[in-house]
């Protein structure tokens, strides 16, 4: 043992391995007793995710560090009890529900643009995380995504590229992008349509060609004595359906080899260009009125319809002494018949020659024939 007058030599052992017998330990006169509890750990509560830096309050922190006191150990082949504090790095799994609550309060709740393949004719659409996160909250074991936002984003993007909605099962869905036009602006909206519900184009064409044209009976042609095949004119319900049929436009003399494949149409066209120009009227009706929800194929038709809600009446009768105004042009044309006396709609029943300026008045009149017949 060295004397008290000898100088004390300090050896630095940091980052070096020195045999225990090389280091000479100095005994201590007094040892302070410290009560220790084994396996006691104090941790700092933070929010974050496993395997990444901790995020709390908008700042990033290093991985969680716990200070853990251990019982005395014999490091130098001696029996001296000493208090020793070591720094131990460990991982703590924070429940993903807390992470969800944090994300819902941040900009992750806003909408995210999903990339879409242009070859699939899909426009960029939007999806929000809030709906998925609310469904997963509190269902860690049952959640199909396991609280992993990256995995959920991958599923959504893959579904958008393939035209399949990941939240609608195994069915094949086709995405359609529509535009809701309101009085204050336009609002994009994405819709999904089940491909299994699409009709066979051949069957649609055959059904369209078999539909007869009854519009001629509304403009002067009389019902035949034997009646109309397939329609009981004495049945008020069938007669009402007859009056609701839309008239067909007259066809020209040139050949029309190309048929429209939409169900219930069956129109023929001279070439593919004319058919494609016509095909857009079958939808989808992407221009939707924000006031009443009525949809239109063309934006011009929607703007004309919105005049009903705004109260604007740009169409005015030009007859002297009248000056009435209308929101729609065809209402003005119908009104003008009052001044001209034109009544193009004639009752089709035999021995009845009543004429009307509006088709709605004729349809109401036709139903009176059945009512009078049932009263007799």
UniProtKB/Swiss-Prot annotation:
Which molecular function GO terms apply here? cis-regulatory region sequence-specific DNA binding; DNA-binding transcription activator activity, RNA polymerase II-specific; DNA-binding transcription factor activity, RNA polymerase II-specific; RNA polymerase II cis-regulatory region sequence-specific DNA binding; sequence-specific DNA binding; sequence-specific double-stranded DNA binding; zinc ion binding
Q: Which domain of life is it from?
A: Eukaryota
Keywords, in A-Z order: Activator, DNA-binding, Metal-binding, Nucleus, Repeat, Repressor, Transcription, Transcription regulation, Zinc, Zinc-finger
Swiss-Prot/TrEMBL GO biological process terms: positive regulation of transcription by RNA polymerase II; regulation of transcription by RNA polymerase II
Residue span of region Mediates transcriptional repression: 241-376
Give the signal peptide range: none
User: Which residue stretches are annotated zinc finger (C2H2-type)?
Assistant: 258-282, 287-309, 315-339, 345-369
Keyword Nucleus appears in the UniProt entry = yes
Q: Which InterPro entries match?
A: YY1-like, Znf_C2H2_sf, Znf_C2H2_type
Per its database record, what is this protein's job? Functions as a multifunctional transcription factor that may exhibit positive and negative control on a large number of genes. May antagonize YY1 and function in development and differentiation.
Source organism? Rattus norvegicus (Rat)
Q: What is this protein called?
A: Transcription factor YY2
Q: Where is this region: Disordered?
A: 201-220
| Keyword Repeat carried by entry | yes
Q: Please name the gene that encodes this protein.
A: Yy2
Q: Which PANTHER family match?
A: TRANSCRIPTION FACTOR YY2, TRANSCRIPTIONAL REPRESSOR PROTEIN YY
Region Mediates transcriptional activation, residue ranges: 36-109
PROSITE patterns under this entry? ZINC_FINGER_C2H2_1 (PS00028), ZINC_FINGER_C2H2_2 (PS50157)
User: GO CC terms for this protein?
Assistant: chromatin; nucleus; PcG protein complex; transcription regulator complex
Where does it localize? Nucleus
Question: Any miscellaneous information on file?
Answer: The gene encoding this protein appears to have arisen by retrotransposition of the YY1 gene in placental mammals. It is encoded by a single exon found in an intron of the gene Mbtps2.
Family, per entry: Belongs to the YY transcription factor family.
UniProt main location, coarse: nucleus
């Amino acid at each position: 043992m060295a004397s008290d007058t000898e100088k004390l030599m300090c050896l630095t052992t940091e980052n070096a391995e020195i045999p225990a017998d090389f280091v000479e330990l100095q005994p201590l006169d007094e040892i302070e007793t410290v009560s220790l509890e084994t396996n006691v750990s104090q941790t700092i509560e933070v929010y974050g995710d496993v395997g990444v830096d901790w995020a709390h309050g908008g700042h990033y922190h290093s991985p969680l560090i716990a200070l853990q006191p251990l019982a005395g150990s014999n490091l130098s082949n001696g029996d001296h009890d000493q208090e020793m504090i070591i720094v131990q790095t460990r991982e703590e799994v924070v429940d993903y529900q807390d992470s969800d609550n944090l994300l819902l309060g941040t900009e992750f709740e806003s909408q995210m643009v999903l990339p879409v393949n242009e070859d699939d004719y899909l426009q960029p659409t939007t999806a929000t995380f809030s709906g998925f996160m609310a469904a997963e909250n509190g269902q860690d074991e049952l959640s199909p995504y396991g609280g992993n936002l990256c995995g959920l984003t991958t599923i959504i993007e893959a579904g958008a590229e393939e035209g399949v909605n990941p939240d609608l099962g195994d069915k094949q869905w086709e995405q359609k992008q529509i535009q809701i036009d309101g009085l204050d602006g336009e609002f994009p909206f994405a819709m999904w349509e089940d491909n299994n519900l699409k009709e066979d184009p051949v069957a649609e064409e055959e059904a369209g060609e078999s539909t007869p044209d009854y519009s001629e009976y509304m403009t002067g042609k009389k019902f035949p004595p034997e009646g109309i095949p397939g329609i009981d004119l004495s049945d008020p319900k069938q007669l009402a359906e007859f009056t609701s049929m839309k008239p067909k436009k007259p066809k020209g003399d040139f050949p029309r080899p190309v048929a429209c494949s939409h169900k219930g149409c069956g129109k023929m066209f001279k070439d593919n260009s004319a058919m494609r120009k016509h095909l857009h009227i079958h939808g989808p009706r992407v221009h939707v009125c924000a006031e009443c929800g009525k949809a239109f194929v063309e934006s011009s038709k929607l703007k004309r319809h919105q005049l009903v809600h705004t109260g604007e009446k740009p169409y005015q009768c030009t007859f002297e002494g009248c000056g009435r105004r209308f929101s729609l042009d065809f209402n003005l044309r119908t009104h003008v018949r009052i001044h001209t006396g034109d009544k193009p709609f004639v009752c089709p029943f035999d021995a009845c020659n009543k004429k009307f300026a509006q088709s709605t008045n004729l349809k109401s009149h036709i139903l009176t024939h059945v009512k009078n017949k049932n009263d007799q």
